[in-house]
Amino acid sequence: NKIFLVNWLEAISKFKMYLKIERGLSENSIESYSSDLKSFYGYIKKNKFSENPKKCNSEIIKKYIYDQSKINSPKTQARRISGIRSFFDYLTFESFIKTNPTDLIETPKIGKKLPDSLSLNEIIKFINNIDLSHPQGIRNRAIIETLYGSGLRVSELISLKLSNLFFKENLIKVFGKGNKERLVPMGKLSKKYIKIYLKNERLKSKIIKKYSDTIFLNRNGSQISRVMIFKIIK
C-alpha cells in the first residue's frame, strides 16, 4: 500500500494536508510553509535538479541556502530552513525517503536582542552565571535561550503552551499581537533546556489546572508574569 511521490508539487500538497489535519495549523501558517517550499522548488526548477524530492540531497539545500543568504536576512533564512527541514521530516516519517538531507544543516543564528536591549556579550555572561543547581535555574535558562534563540517578545514567551511545541520539527507556534500566528525556529539549546525543565522541575510542580498547558510557571503553579521575566533578565 506504499505511496510513491512523483514530484515536488505533489509532495508539497501532501505536506500541507499533514499540517492541517495532523498539526492543526491555521491556513496562514500553512501558506507560509507552502510559500517557502515553493521558493525552494523554484530554485530546484531553475537549476534543473530532479523533479523527484527523493533525489534532493544536502548539497542542493546548502547551495540554496547560500543563494538565499545573499538576498535574505538570517531570520528569513532560518524560517525557510526550518520549513524545508519540517518538510523532509514529514517525508521521512511517512517513509517516502530514508534519511532527512537537512539533518547536518545548521540554522543561521537569528541574533535578535532581548527585550531590554542586552548586548550579545551581556546575554552570554548572564547565561553563564545562571545557577543550574537552583530549582528555578533550568527554567530560567530555558526562558533565556527561547527568548534569544527564537526572537520572542516577553508577552509571547509567557503565553507559550505545551501544545505550541513541535520538537520533531524544531518549531514553536507563537501567537503575537492581534493573536496573529506564526512559526519560529526552536534552537538546539532552547530545545535542550525546555526538555530538561519539562521532565524535571515542571513535572514536580503543583500546577493550577487553568495553566496545565502553559510551559513556564512560577512557584505557585501559575503562568509566570512579565515582571518575573524582567527580574530574571536583570
Segments from the language model and where they lie:
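Conserved catalytic core of the tyrosine transesterase superfamily
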Residues: 1-234
